[in-house]
UniProtKB/Swiss-Prot annotation:
It comes from Burkholderia cenocepacia (strain ATCC BAA-245 / DSM 16553 / LMG 16656 / NCTC 13227 / J2315 / CF5610). Its cofactor is Fe(2+); Mn(2+). It catalyses: D-mannonate = 2-dehydro-3-deoxy-D-gluconate + H2O. Catalyzes the dehydration of D-mannonate. Pathway: Carbohydrate metabolism; pentose and glucuronate interconversion. The keyword Lipoprotein does not apply. GO terms for molecular function: ferrous iron binding; manganese ion binding; mannonate dehydratase activity. This is Mannonate dehydratase. Its EC number is 4.2.1.8. Pfam families: UxuA.
Length: 353
C-alpha cells in the first residue's frame, strides 16, 4: 500500500513541506488545474509539476483528476475531438511516469454537499449532506464546491441542465462505454490505469442520472472494457453514503479482481434517511468499519495507492473545506497504523511455529 495525499498545487495552503512531514506519506496526488476542461494537458506542465513534487522528497504517480468534458458525457457530435484530446493527455501522463488517472462521469456536479462547515459536538467542522436541503436548492442559481473542475454561471448551468433532460441512465451508460472503448487502448499503451470514481453521493441529484452508485454499477463498468487498465477508484465515503453498499465486500470482490487502482478511505455517519456527515477516519466515529475495510485491502494483496479523503477542520485550521492538513494527516497515520498491524501480526503465528 502506497500512502498518498492530495495537493492542489502552489495555491494550496497545505504545502508540500508540511505533507512531507506526515509519517508514512510518500506520494502526492495532484493535477494540472489551469487548463480548460477538454484541452490537452501540455507535457511541459506535467513534467514541471512532477519536478516540484520530487524536489520536496515525494513521488507523483497518481493524477486526480483529468476532468471529462460534459459534451462527452452528453454524447454530443463534438465529443470525438474532445476524446482525442483526452487520449493525448493520457499519453503525456504516461510518458511522465504517471501510473493511475482518477476521473468521474458525474453529470454537471462533482461531489455535492449541502454544508461545508457543519459543527460537530467536539467543535470541529465537517462536510455534510441533507436530502431535504438538496430539495430546496435551485441549481440554476449556481453552486460551487472546492475541487470542482469548474463553476458555472447561472445561464451556463441552466443550459447544461436542459441538455441533460434528454439523457437518462441508459444514454449515460452508452456514452461512458463509447468513451472507455476509445481511451482504454491508449491507456494500455501508455502504461496508465484509469480509475473511475463513484458518484458522490451515490444517488441522483437534481434529476440528473447517476451510474456509478453501487456494486452492480461497478461490475458493469469493469465489464464494458475487460482490461486491467479499466479500473476503479474505490471511495469508501462516497459508496458508504449509500446504506445498501457493503464497502468491505466491494473491496474484497473488486480487489480480488485486481481492478481497484486507487483507494480513498474515509468515514461517514449515515442516518436512516440517507443524510450523512463526514467524520474522523476512526471506525467508532462513523458508520463504516474502517479497520475491516483496510483488512479487506490487505487480505486481497492490494499494493496500489491510498489516500485519506476529506477531513474535518480541527484545531482552528482554515482553508478548503474537507482538505485541511491536520485531520487528513491524522487519517493517514491511522490508516498506516492499521496496515502495519495487519502486516506484522497476520504473519506472527506462522513465524512462531
Amino acid at each position: 500500500m502506497k500512502m498518498s495525499f492530495r495537493w492542489y498545487g502552489e495555491s494550496d495552503p497545505v504545502s508540500l513541506q508540511y505533507i512531507r512531514q506526515i509519517p508514512g506519506v510518500t506520494h502526492i496526488v495532484s493535477a494540472i488545474y489551469d487548463e480548460p476542461v477538454g484541452e490537452v494537458w501540455p507535457a511541459h506542465k506535467i513534467e514541471a509539476l512532477k519536478a516540484t513534487i520530487e524536489r520536496a522528497g515525494l513521488q507523483f504517480d497518481v493524477v486526480e483528476s483529468v476532468p471529462v468534458h460534459e459534451d462527452i458525457k452528453l454524447g454530443k457530435p463534438g465529443r470525438d475531438r474532445l476524446i482525442d484530446h483526452y487520449r493525448q493527455t493520457i499519453r503525456h501522463l504516461g510518458a511522465a511516469g504517471i501510473r493511475v488517472v482518477c476521473y468521474n462521469f458525474m453529470p454537471v456536479f462533482d461531489w455535492t454537499r449541502t454544508e461545508l462547515s457543519k459543527t460537530l459536538d467536539d467543535g470541529s467542522t465537517c462536510l455534510a449532506f441533507s436530502t431535504d436541503a438538496v430539495d430546496r436548492i435551485d441549481p440554476n442559481d449556481g453552486i460551487a464546491l472546492p475541487g470542482w473542475d469548474s463553476s458555472y454561471r447561472p445561464e451556463q448551468l441552466q443550459a447544461l441542465l436542459a441538455d441533460y433532460r434528454d439523457v437518462d441512465e441508459n444514454a449515460l451508460w452508452a456514452n461512458l462505454e463509447y468513451f472507455l472503448k476509445a481511451i482504454i487502448p491508449v491507456a494500455e499503451e501508455a502504461g496508465v490505469k484509469m480509475a473511475i470514481h463513484p458518484d458522490d453521493p451515490p444517488r441522483p441529484i437534481f434529476g440528473l442520472p447517476r451510474i456509478v452508485k453501487n456494486r452492480d454499477d461497478l461490475a458493469r463498468i469493469v465489464r464494458l472494457v475487460d482490461s486491467p487498465a479499466n479500473g476503479l477508484t474505490l471511495c469508501s465515503g462516497s459508496l458508504g453514503a449509500g446504506p445498501e453498499n457493503d464497502v468491505e465486500a466491494l473491496v474484497r470482490e473488486f480487489g480480488a479482481m485486481g481492478r481497484i487502482h486507487f483507494a480513498h478511505i474515509r468515514n461517514v455517519k449515515v442516518d436512516a434517511n440517507g443524510d450523512f456527515e463526514e467524520t474522523a477516519h476512526l471506525s467508532s466515529c462513523g458508520s463504516l468499519d474502517i479497520a475491516a475495510i483496510v483488512k479487506a485491502y490487505h487480505d486481497t494483496g492490494f499494493t496500489g495507492y491510498v489516500r485519506p479523503d476529506h477531513g474535518r477542520m480541527i484545531w482552528g485550521e482554515t482553508g478548503k473545506p474537507g482538505y485541511g492538513l491536520y485531520d487528513r494527516a491524522l487519517g493517514a497515520v491511522y490508516l498506516n497504523g492499521l496496515w502495519e498491524a495487519l502486516a506484522k501480526f497476520d504473519r506472527a503465528p506462522q513465524a512462531s511455529q
